[in-house]
Amino acid sequence: MKKIISSIAIALACTAAYANTPQLDTLFESDWQWTLSHSPETATTLGDNRYNHKLSNTSLAAARVYNKHQQDMLKEALKIKRDSLSGQELISYDQFVLEKQQAIRAAELYPYTVQPITQIDGLQITLPSLVSQTPFNNAFDYHNYLARLHAIPAYVDGIIEQLQENMKTGWVAPKVIIAPVPGQLHDLRLHLDESEFGTPFHHIPANVPRPEVFAARGKKELSEHVAPALLKLENFLITQYLPACRDSIAASSLPAGMPYYDFMVKNGTTTDLTAQQIHDIGLTEVARIKAEMQRVMDQVGFKGSFAEFTVFLNTDPRFFYTNSDDLLNGFRDIIAHVYQVLPTMFAHLPKAQAEVKPIPLLGSEQQPAAYYNPGPDDGSRSGYFAVNVSNLNTRAKWEMETLTLHEAIPGHHLQISIAKEATDLPKFRRNGWYNAFGEGWALYSEGLGYEMGFYKDPYSKFGNLNDELFRAARLVVDTGIHALGWSREQAITYLNENTANPPNDNQVEIDRYIAWPGQALGYKIGQLKINQLRAKATTALGDKFDLRAFHNAVIDNGPIPLSVLETQIDLWISQQQAKH
């Protein structure tokens, strides 16, 4: 990624600029407003309710408009004199240019959506989830929601058009990740009224006039527009798309070949590491962490093998709740403890408090153990830590501490909330996402548990090590699947033999990596970089090193590429040395 940013600088230096350079904030704001107007779902999740009556245009024509917009924005950015910028303006400028170049490169590989729907990402998951982030405070909100429901058939038609283009061009998904989708659509269609789609009509606020009218209109939209659209997509997948899907699972087997996976690796890690280099890093880290796990097994006096210990951890009743409320409250207790010690780790904290909510049961079996859902920009709702309460016999107590530190605080909630509250940054940076930075920070945060008084129970320590091992194993299996010719069964077996996760979870995870090439690489690569920078700062500053200040130096500027983070921390080290 350093090479990418360097090339940006060279290109800018050679580009003629207008005598009257446009203000950066005008360019950023123009692009941001275009993004919100063309992605109403994004606007809703950020608390901007101007487009709550709409859904994105999912047609091929809309994709071409998007690609043209990225090109136009890059041209406008290159008219600005880069050497006239400094500080945050320069960081923002370089990030903006980089993001546009990445979008343009993606379109060069394939100009439309590569996978418009999968078992982990598609309208059957995203649209119901969107409802929980939509306001229902007055009649206007309900009119907006009815209009959005009415737009679902056109949204589905666009998805089908994208899938048809996939079939024409050979950019079809692997069968294994599409096979569950018709069932997901079927279940949602049969339970629309009790799903998130129908919930707003069961709890209409008292201030909304004639609630029975809205309830009736809602039922009509669901039965006459949403259900037929879902059935149409379900039938299309079964009769046309699924038979055309590929048996191969590697991203490198797509028409663009290995360059496509190389792009996804660069996108997921913001580094220039090759797939083979990442694979080798993963193997080294797996061996190191497994040795630490063996020491925990020795500590608790377990005499069997690693595989036998994982069976014990995943079957002994002492490690599981039998009631979902108890599980949720257990996570809430951990968060309360974290908040007590957080000031010892950070110089300043966000105002927004983390909440815990259950993942909706419908479709939850294809969802991870937990994830983080950010709050809107206006702070009207906190982000929340979503917990999977299905299959309680797989939600182990020994992984709860490390999971909380990752998904909530000081992981995703803390990092994302601080970014959202940094009003001096342009909106695209406050709400941006670099996988290696965000997930790397969250994995690094798990490691902070030792300094915060967690993992005192050896089984919880094993849980933390297992989570780190899991992220290291991802480096092995993601590159194995997409670059080195691994089969799905080989990848599942590797996770089963090298992690303490339940076999069913490992199967779900492998299918996730198949559906989302390169994404799983960011966690470990990002964590290793932050650990490296902390060690560098500690050595350079000695007894002047301030851990609280270091942490805020890492996250106070919003999500950034790892190469930019390294430059930023080098500058911070120099500033600290100058102070002393």
Where are these regions (language model features)?
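N-terminal maturation segment of proteins
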Residues: 19-580
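Gram-negative bacterial Sec-dependent N-terminal signal peptides
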Residues: 1-18
